[in-house]
Amino acid sequence: MNVTILAANLRVKADMPVEIAATVDGETLQVALEWALIERWLGQLANDAGAVRNAIHQRRQAIERVIQSRVYAHGVPISGEMTLGLRDLGGRM
């Protein structure tokens, strides 16, 4: 299974999930990263779009592995949407 995070503009707004796009074997998914996760990673820098982009880039492999695991376990969501949070990535600093 091939999972890739796609480059895109990020919209960063406090208390709102940060949405990224990913492909899973050619199918596009919208992946929402919960705000609590972004805050855990970045603390006070969470409102800085550049810092968020860098944090996602640094954790790209971990994010792709979690997406892959979720798809293996449950299949590609019919809605084309997935949410990842502290439970999924909180320990992957």
Where are these regions (language model features)?
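Intrinsically disordered, low-complexity regulatory segments
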Residues: 2-5, 28-29, 37, 86, ...
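A generic short-segment signal for beta-strand/edge and adjacent turn/coil regions
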Residues: 1-3, 32, 50-55
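A short, structured beta-strand/loop element
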Residues: 19-44
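Short, charged/polar N-terminal "headpieces" of proteins
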Residues: 1-27
